Amino acid sequence: MKRKLSILVLAAVGAAMLAGCGAGTANGSTAADNAANESTTDVATDKADASATDSSENVTAEVPEDNGTVSTDGSTSMEKVIGALGESFMAQNDGVTFTYNPTGSGSGITAVAEGRCDIGLSSRNLKDDEVAQGLKQTVLAYDGIAIIVNPENEVSDLDVETIAKIYTGEITNWKDVGGKDAEIVLIGREAGSGTRDGFESITGTEDKCLYRQELTSTGDVITTVAQNPDAIGYASLASVKDTVKAVSVGGVVPTEETVKDASYVIQRPFVLVTKEGTELTPTAQKFFDYVTSADAAEIIAKAGAVAAN
């Protein structure tokens, strides 16, 4: 462009000189002015080129900075699985730092939407309004939701209908389901929990549960049930310890195999949440690709869940 503009200016100077031979000082001034205009045009073009270069540099600067850290935020039920994957990833990549903030599914989804973490963690599928915000889900694994009681409790099997009646207050005493004469103490998770969302949607008890306590983490639910012989709760199968007893549901024991073949019906997905149009850093993208590959399946299985891939 610069060269083209210069050629046009020189042609104009030549035409003026031919038309004004012997015309005196006035035409000489015109030629000088045209020469000056050529210089001015060149300067302006240089500035335009520089501006274009600056603009290009600004676009490049918008690519996310990679500081070697992968930050995740969300589901407490995913702690065992995501922790194992994070440790494995760091072991294979020197200098990389992996962080996990166990805030709950709802908070993790919000953190991604607001750009406060690389990857959100949810133990439920995204809702329509969350997808409308430009959020995207990728299923990492599947996890059973275990129905847990105190080890001293004689009850060992409940069907989905009975579980629903217990949590909605239709059944209030353990003797009505084969246990001792004692009031059933209902333990659950807080609103916004992916585990609660999964449990209530499967049992058909949304907004109907009469919780005695609504706790903020999987670990708190397990600890509370372990300490109260009359309590019942629900928790990620991957996190269940021998301090509580997981009852069978409709005669099916919750295991990796029964979750995988779907015979254990109280189960939900473990989801990675990202934002459409927001590029992950190279390190975060490498982590995402790793955990969703077949290479991670064994680690996920050892953590008690069933890999989606």
Predicted regions and their residues:
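N-terminal leader and targeting sequences that precede the mature domain
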Residues: 9, 21-22
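Positively charged n-region of N-terminal signal peptides that target proteins for export
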Residues: 1-7, 11
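C-terminal motif of bacterial Sec signal peptides marking the signal peptidase cleavage site
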Residues: 16-20
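Exported/periplasmic ABC-transporter solute-binding proteins
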Residues: 4, 22-309
